[in-house]
Regions:
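Substrate-binding rim/cap in mid-to-C-terminal beta-strand-loop elements of soluble/periplasmic
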Residues: 1-48, 52-67, 150, 168
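Short intrinsically disordered coil segments
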Residues: 24-28, 112-119, 173-175
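Flexible loop/turn segments at secondary-structure boundaries
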Residues: 18-19, 78, 106-108, 166-167, ...
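Active-site-proximal beta-strand/loop segments in catalytic clefts of secreted hydrolases
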Residues: 13-15, 73, 101-102, 161
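Long, internal low-complexity/basic segments
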Residues: 138-155, 160-236
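C-terminal cap/loop subdomain of S1 sulfatases and analogous C-terminal strand-loop tails that border
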Residues: 41-156
Length: 236
């Protein structure tokens, strides 16, 4: 959601920025920074990089076409059974946010059971705070708690102009089906182009990476990586 992904980016480069002091509303990704640095240094950008250099924006070009930003999430804190993450991908345009949750049966904010969290806290993706405690324990805030911690559908679609905080999911609304299908296809095309294993069917190893933090709950551990995954990802 925008609350976690829409962040400011400030760049200072006296020799490389034309008409400095500008504010650009172009959609960019962190993955665009590496090719920007390489291009600025006169180094060829490897084909494996999926980001696009920001040189056109820095040079003040007005016909820049950056119509979408792509977002991904896998595992953050170890707060689900077996150390699994919450795989999702998203596409953000100037008008819409479309999210694909690949395993909607998992808890997006972490399990409500302490035993599944490496830190032994409920909904471990959200750090402890008085606000979190009140939301979990006070019945009158049940709706807010569900928005923050509850399970989510396989697809989410939000109209930014009418819903800046992304609270009203339009993915199943008839009048937005064409928009949903178009954004779904754009996201799929990007994931295929970038070789994302969540879409290509290749082994997705994020759920099996080891955790290097001592668990507070006895017996907590990451699920072992399947043998076929180990063979598929041997480094040559």
């Amino acid at each position: 959601y925008d609350a976690g992904t829409h962040v400011p980016l400030a760049i200072r480069w006296p020799k490389g920025i034309r008409t400095p002091g500008r504010v650009s509303h172009s959609l960019v990704n962190l993955s665009d920074l590496a090719p920007t640095f390489l291009e600025a240094a006169g180094i060829s950008i490897p084909k494996m990089m999926t980001g696009k250099a920001l040189t056109d924006i820095l040079q003040g070009k007005t016909n820049v076409k950056r119509e979408a930003a792509f977002i991904a999430m896998e595992r953050h804190a170890g707060c689900r059974e077996g150390g699994k993450g919450y795989p999702c991908r998203a596409i953000r345009t100037k008008e819409y946010l479309y999210i694909r949750n690949f395993d909607p049966d998992r808890w997006p904010a972490g399990s409500p059971e302490r035993k599944h969290c490496v830190r032994h806290i409920r909904y471990g993706e959200v750090d402890p705070s008085p606000t979190k405690t009140v939301m979990m324990d006070e019945p009158k805030y049940a709706k807010l708690a569900d928005l923050a911690f509850g399970k989510r559908p396989a697809e989410e679609l939000y109209l930014i102009s009418n819903d800046p905080h992304q609270l009203r999911n339009l993915a199943d609304a008839k009048e937005f089906q064409k928009t949903r299908d178009l954004l779904r296809q754009q996201l799929d095309d990007h994931l295929k182009k970038s070789g994302d294993p969540r879409l290509t069917g290749k082994p997705a190893l994020w759920d099996y990476y080891p955790f290097y933090r001592a668990p507070k709950f006895p017996g907590w551990k990451v699920a072992p990586m399947p043998a076929e995954f180990q063979k598929a990802h041997k480094v040559k």
